[in-house]
Amino acid sequence: MEPNGTVHSCCLDSIALKVTISVVLTTLIFITVAGNVVVCLAVSLNRRLRSLTNCFIVSLAATDLLLGLLVMPFSAIYQLSFKWSFGQVFCNIYTSLDVMLCTASILNLFMISLDRYCAVTDPLRYPVLVTPVRVAISLVFIWVISITLSFLSIHLGWNSRNGTRGGNDTFKCKVQVNEVYGLVDGMVTFYLPLLIMCVTYYRIFKIAREQAKRINHISSWKAATIREHKATVTLAAVMGAFIVCWFPYFTAFVYRGLRGDDAVNEVVEGIVLWLGYANSALNPILYATLNRDFRMAYQQLFHCKLASHNSHKTSLRLNNSLLSRSQSREGRWQEEKPLKLQVWSGTELTHPQGSPVRTRLSHSSCLLSLSLLSFIWKLGTWIHHRRPFQPSLHISA
């Protein structure tokens, strides 16, 4: 009985562990997809965010969104089942997508650091340095490097030790790494961008401190200290998240290339892999939420939904109140009018084809719409009392 109880306890622990891991991975996937969808939606609905500076942030969000949709779900299934069940051909496609999107995500972060470095260190020449053509070339460069290190290398077998494109074990699916591929991929994808990002963000931090000290002569010492603290926290969060998420993975990646594909424990390999994926969930927070324009766009985006809901409820209460007051003196015409008003208030929240799309809804617009509702209702009531024998005209009006 004791051995059976021990086995049962181990099984329960295993099931509980799997459930916990599945909840964590599912939550991470959801945050990655939802966060990057919000970034793309905010840029598409807010014209103020459609700038060259935000091209790299949109590219980063699109890359992380594809990673959350095309790669992370299969990685979660593979991590929980401990075997690959989708065939060797799809394994090559999956690993190629994984390497390509992770590489593109990191290179987008690298380009963002260069863009901000140019904007802070030489703001007067920034429009000359950062042009649409150069931004387009940078984006093409990101994807050329990413595709070269992923699809091209994996499908030509540049990453394997024996020249084959797939492993011998059909139930395993992970990127093979030889010495050359491990060192080249690690240097191009992570270590070289990390070094340059450290230099650029250090320069940005120094300039931010100098500006805070200059402001200190004009404003209060406390305000300058707060600005300096915010700049420090922001840059520390950006660099800290990047290093914590990706440094363990690329250390294990290069170590596998030097020592062999089985040199790293599978559990450790899975942990560092998902730690790298977590950076895609943090990017919308670090690179968008810390931006004032993006924060305003988020507020307008969510406030629009809340204001639309409140406006609809207020219009319904107004219709019901007007209906109850008019039932004692009006006939069939008053029973149809609230429906007309309700439909009209609904069209206030939609956009007919061919009209310009409203991107935000504020309290003032809600109050204006309610005022117009009240005015039209009073005007219709006045016309009805003046011309009581033409109710059909009042309804159409």
Swiss-Prot record:
Could you tell me the Gene Ontology terms of the biological process aspect for this record?
digestive tract development; epithelial cell morphogenesis; gastric acid secretion; gastrin-induced gastric acid secretion; gland development; histamine-induced gastric acid secretion; memory; positive regulation of vasoconstriction
Disulphide-bonded residues = 91-173
| Cellular location(s) | Cell membrane
SMART domains attached to this UniProt entry = 7TM_GPCR_Srsx (SM01381)
Residues in compartment: Extracellular: 1-22, 82-92, 160-179, 258-266
InterPro entries in alphabetical order = GPCR_Rhodpsn (IPR000276), GPCR_Rhodpsn_7TM (IPR017452), Histamine_H2_rcpt (IPR000503)
Its keywords, alphabetically, are: Cell membrane, Disulfide bond, G-protein coupled receptor, Glycoprotein, Lipoprotein, Membrane, Palmitate, Receptor, Transducer, Transmembrane, Transmembrane helix
Q: Where is this chain primarily localised?
A: membrane
Site location (Implicated in histamine binding): 189
Site features described as Essential for tiotidine binding and implicated in histamine binding, chain residue numbers: 185
Q: What's the superkingdom here?
A: Eukaryota
What is the membrane topology noted in the UniProt record heading this document? Multi-pass membrane protein
User: Gene Ontology terms, cellular component aspect?
Assistant: plasma membrane
Q: Where is this site: Essential for histamine binding?
A: 98
Which GO MF terms are attached to this record? histamine receptor activity
Residue positions of covalent lipid attachment, annotated as S-palmitoyl cysteine: 304
Q: Which family does the entry's similarity section mention? A: Belongs to the G-protein coupled receptor 1 family.
Name of the protein described by the UniProt record: Histamine H2 receptor
Encoding gene (name): Hrh2
